[in-house]
Amino acid sequence: MTIFNHTLGFPRIGLNRELKKAQEDYWSGNLLYEDFLCVGSQLRRENWKKQKDAGIDYIPVGDFAWYDHVLSTSMMLGNIPERHLNVNDNKIDLDCLFRIARGCSPDVAASEMTKWFNTNYHYIVPEFNKNRILKFSWKQILEETDEALLLGYKVKPIILGPITYLWLGKIKGEYFDRLDLLKNILPIYKQVLRELSQRNIDFVQIDEPALVLDLPEKWKKAYSYAYEYLNGTTKILLTTYFDSIEHNIEYIRDLPIYGIHIDLVFGKYNLFDFNSKLPKEWILSLGVINGRNVWRADLIKLFKSISTILKFRKKLLIGSSCSLLHSPIDLQKEKNLDKESKKWFSFAVQKCTELSLLSKALNKNDTDSIQKWCSSIYERNFSKRVQKIEVQNRLSEILNVNFKRSDSYNIRSREQKKKFNLPILPTTTIGSFPQTLQIRKLRRDYKQGLINDVDYEIGIKKHIKEVIKEQEKLGIDVLVHGEPERNDMVEYFGENLDGFIFTDNGWVQSYGSRCVKPPIIIGDVSRLKPITVKWSKYAQSLTDKPVKAMLTGPVTILFWSFPREDISLEKIAKQIGLALRDEVLDLEKEKIEIIQIDEPALREGLPLRKSLWNEYLSWAVDAFRLSSSGVKNTTQIHTHMCYCEFHDIMHAISFLDADVITIETARSDMELLKSFKTFKYPNEIGPGVYDIHSSNIPSITSIKFLLNKAIAYIPVERIWVNPDCGLKTRNWNETILALKNMVCAAKEMRDKIKKIT
């Protein structure tokens, strides 16, 4: 038996973020349509070549997306929201795709965006309408398959599976069972598979990550119906990732498919036992190389594990655990990483090399080459940069009292209301203000040593002063300093905490054109000196209004970084929590008495199986409270969350015991607030009243409409008024117009409430 290798997908953004730049140029009218298409074609060709040159046998196609692969599937199925379809003669084209993703006017809003399972990638949520007619409308998968075949590659097309697609979407309008749409979309899937079968391909990868979830019974049974219907078109490799599918094996093993892919990184399998449950004729694809982290793989360990089942399986593939979408592209692009640490890492291109080395070692039963690859892993175990005894000692000395505020919210709230004397429906923002070219240049010049500390501080303070001035002119109640010193909400803190390392080009896609460069946690974490105190203190000196300090929470820093794999996530989170606790207390000493600790990643850290939620939420909440609980009653703690559903973790959110929580709700039309109807959240809430991810300027009427919706769920005396998220990606004109309308809406609502009372 020859063992072949494959990846489940490759990063689509380009080595130098070419896709991001092309998207933004196209949206602004600075790039022609034909030239934009050429950028996409060039990126695909480069990706295929990189994988082939690294030794990948089956080259994936269909993993490229102009914005998001779930949105591409909606386009393929012709599942276009009516408000976007009627803009341009019902034409389903690239501009239609971008309208769905970004919106084009207040009346033609973007579709909702949310997290892709428990990752930091975001997808555009499909909208389902009972009466929508669906048909094969977007032939990107066929065109790109032909493109790769013409170049001589052994091609493996990738399609998001029908059940997972329906699971990820939401009903708009009249309620009906989403599974009723299965009979409408399966003929389209069948048509696509039949057309692919006419090409020179061995099999098609159909992604069904929903199989790792605790699905309702009828959804499990739907798999049988769907894949019986698709049987006979072409060979199907059913692909799962992010967790184990053992709990659903009885529904999977009878499916008429070519084989199954499992994630051996995040799924806890007894491989020998699991293999025995599968049909002998199936090909088994083992996801052994972590697609979501940057550490070099222990190929010797993997060789031994895979070798145990070789004689029991006639056909075997090895691959990445999931798409390499979540990994930076090429470690060789990093010129400033020190020699010691650089040997510890593996990015997408190197992960392809790992798959090639491992498949060759297994086929030859020879471990010489992989032993050499693993030598740096063993060296890391003895590095002084990893283990720090003083951090470990402090963590071991934590007491229960460190996780609790001294008094309840009701007592704190009375003291805070007396101290701050804010109006009903107080206005604030989430933290960041527009990151202008001047701000970016200032930071870049400082980082490159072109300006000194004094000039940098003068420049940053100038921008802070402008932000404070604009907020005062607008009449905002609680101000922020605007974060001009921060390139990214996680990277900035990582740069100022010990235990992190940074890349120059380790970009990964978060959504659309938004890319992030996560820091890497390489050792025990601690704070060496104050991080934000200087800037917040200066901002507060410019105004009599309260200024809110902005910190990124421990769970978000953890999950938006590439974490260590040698200790538990809980330990890392609590180390970060202790470091932030020091920062919070220093802010309080300097009379900064409203402090926001952002935790947008709280929900994405949830295990995909609900049976494991309580354990995770227990330590995640503890890490937050460790950072926030040391302050006085009069210091108001805020937290912010975005892009997520809250209804099933409301108890955990309440246990955070933040005085105020601000949340993303505008894009979902306040739908998330339904959670507050059944769960009486005890503290204050700022439901986002407009979507900052769209360039649309919200009207006063639309903001008041959303506030009235919020009042139906939350007592008005506990509501704050704020945008959905930070304003970093918006320009100043959009920001001023939107905030002006937000403040006007809040004032009009106050006047209305006064008249009623």
UniProtKB/Swiss-Prot annotation:
Q: Where does 5-methyltetrahydropteroyltri-L-glutamate bind?
A: R17, E18, L19, K20, K115, R514, C515, W560, E604
Q: Which residues cross the membrane?
A: none
Highest rank taxon of the organism: Bacteria
Q: Does the keyword Amino-acid biosynthesis apply?
A: yes
Residues the record marks as active site:
H693 (proton donor)
Q: Does the keyword Transcription regulation apply?
A: no
What catalytic activity does the UniProt entry give for this protein? 5-methyltetrahydropteroyltri-L-glutamate + L-homocysteine = tetrahydropteroyltri-L-glutamate + L-methionine
One Gene Ontology MF term = zinc ion binding
- Which PANTHER family does the entry mention? 5-METHYLTETRAHYDROPTEROYLTRIGLUTAMATE--HOMOCYSTEINE METHYLTRANSFERASE
Q: What is this protein called?
A: 5-methyltetrahydropteroyltriglutamate--homocysteine methyltransferase
Q: What is the lineage of its organism?
A: Bacteria, Pseudomonadati, Pseudomonadota, Gammaproteobacteria, Enterobacterales
